[in-house]
């Protein structure tokens, strides 16, 4: 990259890349439109069905925004696995039916026992190797694993045979291409919850 990105103090771009925001949108909500656009694109790529239980792994901005979007779109069962008690409480406030602290739940079999079932769809939004391992262990056979966490230097011990033998569909979603208009519209609708 040769120029500062969108999170720089100042940057130069062409007007066609800008999206007008309503004057009534608070700056703290506007700052979340980019991660919201990531969520919008991920939802499109994953072909999510509101009747199917979804588990979100990761209680950062993208995991919490995914929780909010799915809950407001009428998903009946949205659960979240995270590690920060105040964010787990926020996830419930945003619409998660169940939350679990992975520091208390353990891993692998203990995690499956704690949730009492595998999930048809698991969204990995933590960006951590441990989160990826937990996500994979909680996907039901023939289920889908949507990966939107960015791993940087973190490494997951990915179990390819588990994916193969359980016929798990892997879906990666990166960035927010072509999701900005919907994200701006959604931010207007969800701004009270996004400001929490």
Question: Where do the model's predicted regions map?
Answer:
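C-terminal substrate-binding/catalytic core of Rossmann-like NAD(P)-dependent dehydrogenases/reductases
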Residues: 109-112, 116, 152-196
């Amino acid at each position: 990259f040769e120029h500062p990105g969108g999170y720089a103090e100042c940057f130069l771009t062409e007007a066609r890349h800008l999206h007008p925001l309503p004057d009534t949108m608070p700056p703290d909500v506007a700052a979340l439109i980019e991660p919201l656009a990531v969520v919008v694109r991920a939802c499109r790529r994953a072909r999510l069905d509101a009747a199917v239980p979804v588990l979100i792994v990761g209680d950062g901005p993208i995991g919490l925004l995914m929780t909010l979007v799915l809950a407001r779109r009428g998903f009946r069962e949205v659960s979240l696995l995270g590690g920060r008690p105040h964010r787990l409480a926020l996830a419930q406030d945003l619409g998660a039916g169940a939350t679990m602290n992975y520091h208390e739940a353990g891993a692998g079999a203990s995690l499956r026992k704690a949730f009492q079932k595998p999930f048809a769809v698991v969204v990995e939004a933590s960006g951590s190797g441990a989160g990826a391992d937990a996500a994979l262990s909680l996907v039901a056979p023939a289920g889908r694993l949507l990966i939107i966490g960015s791993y940087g230097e973190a490494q997951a011990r990915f179990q390819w045979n588990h994916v193969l033998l359980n016929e798990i569909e892997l879906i990666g979603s990166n960035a927010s291409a072509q999701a900005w208009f919907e994200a701006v519209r959604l931010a207007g609708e969800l701004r009270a919850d996004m400001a929490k």
